[in-house]
């Protein structure tokens, strides 16, 4: 299974019941197609770069899950059909850049930092 991130933007003026129904549908799609659900974060309401369907603001959600191509296709199909969703984007993150950063060796070790500062001062 591959790792995916999906960010979707909902209309900012939705009631909590409507928001809950959309997020529940998203989780149901992941579960029904045997995906592994990791997290769903509410990033809050933010100003959009440009108005989408006459909404200058949108409520952002971040979804992270593992699954196959069919899962992503079905999730995007359902988001596309829901009028409460303004935009969405799914990205394959199987090769995470965080791993590459973690493998890097620091230029100066923590113990060497005071010695380097003293040498530079002289």
UniProtKB/Swiss-Prot annotation:
GO molecular function, one term: small ribosomal subunit rRNA binding
Ribosomal protein among keywords: yes
Gene Ontology biological process terms from the UniProt entry: translation
Keywords: Ribonucleoprotein, Ribosomal protein, RNA-binding, rRNA-binding
GO CC terms in record: cytosolic small ribosomal subunit
UniProt similarity note: Belongs to the bacterial ribosomal protein bS6 family.
Function comment: Binds together with bS18 to 16S ribosomal RNA.
Name of the molecule in the record: Small ribosomal subunit protein bS6
Species in which this protein is naturally found: Trichlorobacter lovleyi (strain ATCC BAA-1151 / DSM 17278 / SZ) (Geobacter lovleyi)
